[in-house]
Amino acid sequence: FYIMAPYWGQANENGIQPYLAGQISQEQALENIVDPMREFMFRQTRESDLALFVNLSEAPRPEGPEDVSTFTLIPAFIISELKTAFQIGFMIYIPFIVIDMIVASTLMSMGMMMLPPVMISLPFKILLFVMVDGWHLLIQSLIMSFR
C-alpha cells in the first residue's frame, strides 16, 4: 500500500468519489480509476516483458503507451514483478547456501556424518539474518525495486 498510495488516492479522487457523487458515468469512472494504475504498471514493467506480451497478443504494434491494451499490460507487469522477486530471493539464498556448505564441510571433516547439517546451520542463518538487519534490508530492497 505504501508504494501504491499516490495512485490509489488519484483513482479515488478522479474516479470513485465523482462516480459516487453522480458527477460521471460508470464507464468514465472506470477509465479514471484504471488510468493511474496503468501509469504505475508502465513505470514498473520492463520493456522486454511488455514487448513479449505485445508480440504474444498478435495485436498491431502499439504507437505509444495509450495503445497498449490493459490485458497485455497486466501480465507483463506481473512477469516483471516476479522477475524482481526471484532476483531478491536469489540474493537472499546465496549467503544461506554458503553457510550450509561451510557447516556441512566442517561436520564432514570432523567425522560427524550422522548429524544433519541443518541442525547446526539454521541457528547461524537466523543469527546472520538478525545481525545484518535482514527485515530492513528486505523491505528496503522491495521498495527500491519500484522506480
What do the PLM-derived regions correspond to, one by one?
Residues 1-147:
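Hydrophobic alpha-helical segments and their helix-loop boundaries in membrane
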